[in-house]
Amino acid sequence: MRKTVLVIFSCFLSLLFVPKTYGQGQDKLLGLLKEELAQQMKELKGEEFPPYHMNYRVIDVTSSVVSASFGALMNSQQYRSRTLVPQIRLGDATLDNFKFAQMGAQQPSSARLPLDEDNNEDAIRQAIWNETNNRYKFAVDMYQRTKAQTTVNVEEEDKAPYFSEVPVEKYYEAPLPVEKTKIDLDEWAKRLKEISAVFKNQPGIMQGDAMMIYTVERRYFVNSEGTEVVQNLPYARIMVFGETKADDGMELPLNLSYFAYDPKDLPSNDKIIADAKEMVKTLKALRVAPMVDPYTGPALLSGPASGVFFHEIFGHRVEGQRMKSESDGQTFKKMVGEYVLPAD
């Protein structure tokens, strides 16, 4: 009896710890990315300008889009795409090819990859090689320009490196079930037609649209230091747009936006329709309202507006690349390692 219990318990533990390992091992795209990165890094090490760091980032996107206007369905579709963004750094962390080229490539800054790795492995490998080759050529050109420009420029006060070392990370999420990557298009078409119908037969309303977008991103990241990260990012948005025009010709648009990580957590139609009706009232009031004179002084911002304001006046100013760019304000240039906001 004791042996039987031990055997059953051992089998249970085996089953408990198999799924994660099995899922990661069966993720063919992850394996392809790791193999190609190692191979390309090995080959480029023999070039005149060898990379000191490389990484591959792939975003596999499944999207569902439904839109309606004035109660009529305008669009209903699901699609999938996969893009690759390699990064190749030449030189070293004190001076590399990203000094003047923050994206590390000419436009477009990403390449399309085939979707079916089971039947198109060679095509995926070829696409990775092509984009890596293009990025490397651009990296060499930018690195040579950077060195030449740095030689003739006045020595910079900023000695912060262009690249930071971080610990190696290993993280893997299994793919979401297929039913979690899509929505019922017919159900959402019905909902959006009801929402956008609020604008129908409203005098002076020029636009009355509603749109729902559900996106599931599966993100892959591997680098030459050994980091491997695979994770899922699902998110859903409903957007409502309304617009009118004043007698003097001024266009007056308004919009509503609702966000959730899961479509089932989005507001009900009753809530959105009520908000849309309030939008119609506001649009009608704006159309006949007198012109407001410019104002300079204190202002109170709503929650969403304050978030955007904070992002614009602070968020962009602490971006690393903006600290290195002479064409930017470099507000916090000399505050690396210091608090720029209250700690509490």
Named regions from a protein language model:
Residues 7-16:
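Bacterial N-terminal signal peptides
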Residues 1-4:
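Positively charged n-region of N-terminal signal peptides that target proteins for export
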Residues 20-344:
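Active-site bordering "gate/hinge" segments
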